[in-house]
Amino acid sequence: MKNNLNIKDVEIYYEKWTDEYIDSFGEIFQALTTDSNEELINYIANIIDIKDGMKILDAGCGTCGPSILIAKKYNVNIEAITISQKQLSYSKANINKNNLNNKINVIKGDFHQLKKYYKEDLFDVVYYLESLCHSPEPHEAIKSLNDVIKPGGLLYIKDLYRGPDIPGKLETNDYPINAINENFCLKIQTIGKILDILGINGYKVILCQRPKFNEVFDKGNAFTAKHNIKLLKNQDGPWIDKGLVFLNWLEILAIKHY
């Protein structure tokens, strides 16, 4: 696993690659998707049980694709934060194009330092949609979240994790995980570490599961093929499929318990 990742690396990465992500993924940068963006976001909103009137934080918002779809469907107030100036510019343009300036506010900032930007006990819901994996220190990210989420607030994390290691064959996971970290500016964790961090910070996990929708990896595979990114030894063909052993996509829903 890459150990020297810092938040500046992530900023530089997305300043360079955001246009390419938009070209390949559209406005939702997620490797695990389903048959349509609307279906994906409806699924996530239903799992969280988003309701009108909620105050929501989109932590690591990309170009605000998910938040725009949520704000179109619900009467909510969304604060969105990205580390990238380029993503901020795209987000503002997208929000304006969809006439959602009264529902979504986006800023450039570091989601490890949320109290610099937001009031205490502000949010009913916080979500990280394949964004916490960019954190050099996920414990610091969740600790920062404690300052701004309400007691009883809901936290949703959809992310990729290191798969279970095969005894005597650690390189089976080590090589692709290291390659993914290096190529996509990530620091992939085990699910056990993230669950421990949540427990230490006072979150009660309501569910932890593989997302229950038809899994589609076409955009991620097309992106890596287009840019000739090789993540497997002797790779010949798509690197993502439903039978991966070195990666595990999971969703977590937790409540701020204390």
Predicted regions and their residues:
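A short acidic, Gly/Pro-enriched loop at the edge of an enzyme's catalytic core
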Residues: 115-126
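Short, glycine-/aromatic-enriched active-site segment of Class I SAM-dependent methyltransferases
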Residues: 161-184
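N-terminal, positively charged/glycine-rich alpha-helical extensions of SAM-dependent methyltransferases
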Residues: 1-28
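Class I SAM-dependent methyltransferase SAM/SAH-binding core
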Residues: 66-113
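Conserved class I S-adenosyl-L-methionine
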Residues: 53-62
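Conserved alpha-helix/loop element of class I SAM-dependent methyltransferases that forms part
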Residues: 34-52
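Short alpha-helix
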Residues: 186-201
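A short glycine-rich, Lys/Arg-flanked "PGG" loop and its adjoining helix->strand segment in the class I
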Residues: 139-154
